[in-house]
């Protein structure tokens, strides 16, 4: 299981910080926002319709391009990596591969 230090933003939500784990069935985000207690959010790979790198201003997190997931339920989930920029493309490629397996 791979793990990444990330920022993420769900549709109509504020940015959260924490970690992302690539589990066998989907993504597992664990983190917090401000003083709110930590929470876990899961996204099954089958819910991911498209993966891309978001370069536009409104797609960035922390001023950097993000990995953008177009979700079947509607909306986009943005993932910003705290690690080196090269990891962003690796994560996008891995998520594309994992989400394609569910088709």
Model-derived segments and spans:
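Canonical pleckstrin homology
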Residues: 54-82
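Phosphoinositide-binding peripheral membrane targeting modules
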Residues: 12-16, 23-64
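Short, solvent-exposed aromatic-acidic interface loops
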Residues: 34-35, 82-85
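Anionic N-terminal interaction surfaces
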Residues: 1-24, 41-42, 71-77, 87-93, ...
